[in-house]
Amino acid sequence: MKVYNYNSLVNLSNSILKNFGVETFHDTIPEVDELLKGHKKVVAVLFDGMGQNIVRMHLKENSFIRSHYVTTINSTFPPTTSAATTSFLTGKFPIETGWLAWMEYIKDYDRNVILFRSVDYNTGESLIQKGEPHISDKYFPTRRIDQLINNISKDACEILRYPIQQDGPKHLLTEGVNKLTNYLKDKDECFVYFYWDSPDREMHENGIENWKVKYQVHKAQRFLKKAFKKNPDTLFIFLADHGHVNVKYFDIYEKPDIYSLLDKPLTLEKRTPSFFIKEGKQEEFKKLFNQYYGEYFELISKEDAITMKLFGDGEPAPGVYDVFGDFVATSKGEYGLIASKELYHPDLFKGHHAGGTDEERLIDISIFKN
């Protein structure tokens, strides 16, 4: 499997850090550096799931977003929101942040934990009490680029859709535009990260071609038009965290011979699952996996994943090698892999991401400036 630890979301955020005079962690993207030059007010607008294939499917070539196209970049591996947005917001790869996937095995809990929520993925049980810090803050704390920019006495903030941010906007074209404009209007130099969780949610529920998805993509474009018109002194960067594909599923629980070799529940992602194998059963697992699923998934040993820098380059976060098992598999096409016995609710989405296809990985960047 080829890895793409270059020209990525990580490098894009390092271009932003460089523009604001903050020390960078990785290489920047030269064509973005050139466009940012001299711009003191910058807004990065991320629409979840709106990768290259979705933009090009639902918008015409002469549309507002596509007519401002600058370059195509890579998401993280796996191309999934928790890994990709964390990498963009820190300027570091998943291996450095510890945020590899939607859910990860946390050894001290002996559970799969949804990092965004501190919830047991397999049972739905909350693992913290109200008011307690998130599990991710304990094991994989991060410093975001808005904090780094603020540290050098320049204004920076995040605006996230409610209820992700409690005082965040509920409506994109009214509250979203107004909240952003009100923040920008009195600033001479600032950075804003604006996040909206559509069209990702609509694609999960309906698949990628559905009219609801097209509606959300066009709504995103209307937001960018409106926000840019109201803030002509600001440079806007349009990006996504990943693309989407329509999916089907295999259930490994239906294969008792291979399922019996697992020592723990599947972890990471349905399109990039990781497997903890019972002692001495690794070769048997490898043989059976390739027999049943080799046409659809690429199986990678833990050692090879580390050597090939599958989850990115840089200094590994303490404990990150404990969150995935003896093998990682990634989808070559339309399939995901589940173990139905382990799911407390059947969240089998019609559209998904986090696999190994170009459609999930590639992100078109558009920049709007005067």
Predicted regions and their residues:
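Feature captures the catalytic ectodomains and active-site-proximal regions of enzymes
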Residues: 1-370
